[in-house]
Amino acid sequence: MSRESSRLEDYLRRIHSLSRKNPVHAADLARDLGVSRATVCVFIKQLQEEDYVSVGEHHIITLTPKGAQIAENTCQRLDTVRRLLESLGVPGEIAARDALEIERGLSPQSYEAFHRFNDRNREKAWDLR
């Protein structure tokens, strides 16, 4: 995955996550991503131009259907990788952090294999610790 594609998915995923609790503003996103508000504003403008987000009244950032689809797919992929790592005995916090790194380089074929593995082994209680 390219660096720009990874950045796109990070922003969309964070907007998706933050919007579950409250309306999302550039300052919220900057704080969550650990970047400046100016950096967020520049990238949000690009996301608007590509129809991934819209910025409405009171500067509230929302995902468009196109952006929401990418965010949801990214969240599903992360969840699949995290669940696989946890089934192998990796503690939850570490599994979540590692899933972010692994998911970025995962081919569609490997993702599908992880997903099938999780589905087949859902009922099994793996604990390899």
Regions found by a protein language model. Name each.
Residues H59-R77:
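Basic, amphipathic "hinge/linker" alpha-helix immediately C-terminal to the N-terminal HTH DNA-binding motif
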Residues A38, E93:
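Key DNA-contact positions within bacterial/archaeal DNA-binding proteins
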Residues S2-V35:
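N-terminal helix-turn-helix DNA-binding core of bacterial DNA-binding proteins
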Residues R97-R129:
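C-terminal regulatory/oligomerization modules of transcriptional regulators
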Residues R31, Q48-E49:
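Alpha-helical residues within the helix-turn-helix
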